Curated annotation (Swiss-Prot):
<comment type="function">
    <text>Component of the eRF1-eRF3-GTP ternary complex, a ternary complex that mediates translation termination in response to the termination codons. The eRF1-eRF3-GTP complex binds to a stop codon in the ribosomal A-site. Sup45/eRF1 is responsible for stop codon recognition and inducing hydrolysis of peptidyl-tRNA. Following GTP hydrolysis by sup35/eRF3, sup35/eRF3 dissociates, permitting sup45/eRF1 to accommodate fully in the A-site.</text>
</comment>
<dbReference type="InterPro" id="IPR029064">
    <property type="entry name" value="Ribosomal_eL30-like_sf"/>
</dbReference>
<dbReference type="InterPro" id="IPR004403">
    <property type="entry name" value="Peptide_chain-rel_eRF1/aRF1"/>
</dbReference>
<comment type="subunit">
    <text>Component of the eRF1-eRF3-GTP ternary complex, composed of sup45/eRF1, sup35/eRF3 and GTP.</text>
</comment>
<dbReference type="Pfam" id="PF03465">
    <property type="entry name" value="eRF1_3"/>
</dbReference>
<keyword id="KW-0648">Protein biosynthesis</keyword>
<feature type="modified residue" description="N5-methylglutamine">
    <location>
        <position position="182"/>
    </location>
</feature>
<keyword id="KW-0963">Cytoplasm</keyword>
<dbReference type="GO" id="GO:0005829">
    <property type="term" value="C:cytosol"/>
</dbReference>
<dbReference type="Pfam" id="PF03463">
    <property type="entry name" value="eRF1_1"/>
</dbReference>
<comment type="similarity">
    <text>Belongs to the eukaryotic release factor 1 family.</text>
</comment>
<dbReference type="GO" id="GO:0002184">
    <property type="term" value="P:cytoplasmic translational termination"/>
</dbReference>
<dbReference type="InterPro" id="IPR005140">
    <property type="entry name" value="eRF1_1_Pelota"/>
</dbReference>
<dbReference type="InterPro" id="IPR024049">
    <property type="entry name" value="eRF1_1_sf"/>
</dbReference>
<dbReference type="InterPro" id="IPR005142">
    <property type="entry name" value="eRF1_3"/>
</dbReference>
<keyword id="KW-0488">Methylation</keyword>
<feature type="modified residue" description="Phosphoserine">
    <location>
        <position position="425"/>
    </location>
</feature>
Amino acid sequence: MSETAEKAIEIWKIRRLVKQLINCHGNGTSMITLIIPPGEQISRYSNMLAEEYGTASNIKSRVNRLSVLSAITSTRERLKLYNKVPDNGLVIYCGEVIMEGNKTRKLNIDFEPFKPINTSQYLCDNKFHTEALAELLESDQRFGFIVMDGHQTLYGVVSGSAREVLQRFTVDLPKKHGRGGQSALRFARLRDEKRHNYVRKVAEGAVQHFITDDKPNVAGIVLAGSADFKTELGQSDLFDQRLQSRIIKTVDVSYGGDAGFNQAIELAADTLSNVKYVQEKKLIQRFFDEISLDSGKYCFGVVDTMNALQEGAVETLLCFADLDMIRYEFKNSEGNPVITYMTKEQEEKDSTNSFLLDKDTGAEMELVSSMLLSEWLAEHYKDYGANLEFVSDRSQEGMQFVKGFGGIGAVMRYQLDLSMLDPESDEFYSDSD
C-alpha cells in the first residue's frame, strides 16, 4: 500500500479521534492535554509534571484534587513509555470522562501525529483541547481556482475532499460594434477600458481570497475559462506577483460559474493528483466502471464486502468515512465466534435485542467486542492483503456510493461467487436499510 494511502488512514484516525475528544467532558480540571513538539526533551516535561503534581496537591476540593493527581500520574506514566520525543512530536490526553448516567471512565491516549505538530501545550481543564490537531487536519494543501469568461468570474478552492465557492460575480462587457470610423474607435477604446477594469477587478479579488498575512494561502492556482481572459489575467501586470508564481495550470472550459468550476477540477486532475477530492472521484469511478462492465470483480454492502475480504479477494476496499456500522463479535454456547454488523438505527429498532441471541439455540451469546466497523477495518485491513480507502459523500460520485451502495464496497482481484459463502450476519443486516 502506498505511503500516501497509509497517511490518509492515519489522518482519518486523527479526524475521528478529534470528533470523539470534542464530546468528552469531566468534572473540575481533571482532563489533561499535553502536546510536545519535535526536538524537545522528555526530561523537561517530566520535571514540569512533577512540579504540577506538587501544586495540585494543594487543591482544596478533595474530589477534584484526587482526580487531577490521578490524571497527572497517568500522564507521567504515558511519558515514561518514550525515551525521546518522536519525529512528529507527541500528543497525550489523560483524565476522567463523564459518561452516560453520570458515570466516569478513565481515558488515557498517547500517539505521534501523522506530521510535525509545532505546538507546545499543557492544560488542565474540564475538556480535552484538540485545536492543535484540528489545525493539522485543516492544513492539507489548498488549491485556488479562478473561472473567468466574458460574463462572470468565480473564485473557488479545492482542499482534501472539499470544494468551496468563495465568490462569484457577473460582468456586462460591451460587444464589438459594427460601425466604422470614429464611432468604431470610440467603442473599441470603451471596450478595452471595460475589459481592463474587469481584469483589474478579478486580480484584486484574487489577492482578497488567496493571500493572507502577505502570503499565498494556496499551494497552487488554476486559471480556467473560455476565450483568452484567463491567459490575459495570468500574464497581466495587474495580477499579484506572489500569485503569478503559484499558477500551476491554465485550462479551457466550456462553461462559466459552477459548471465551469467542476470542469476545471476535472481538467486539472493530473496536476491536482494529490488532492483527495480528485483521488476520491477516480477511486469510486473505478468501482463504478467494474459494475458497468459487469466484470464480477466488485462487491458492495457490508455482508458481501466482508466475506470477500475474509477470502482475501479484495484489492481495494472503499468505506464511507462516517459509516454508521458497528461490528459485534460474540461467542456462542459452543465457543465459536459469531460476527454481526448493525447500524445504530437497526439496533434501536431491535427492541428485543434479538441480535444478542444465538439463532440456532435462542440462548444469549457472550459479547467479546464491539467497535465501529470503520475503526476495525483501519486496524485489520492489512491482515487480508487489501488496500483501504476512506471516501466522503462530498463529490457526486461519493454521494452515489453512500446512498446507492451502502457506503462500503470493493474492487476485487478476481471473480468470486459470493452466493456460495455463508454470511453469518445476513439475518441482521439488509443492504437496502
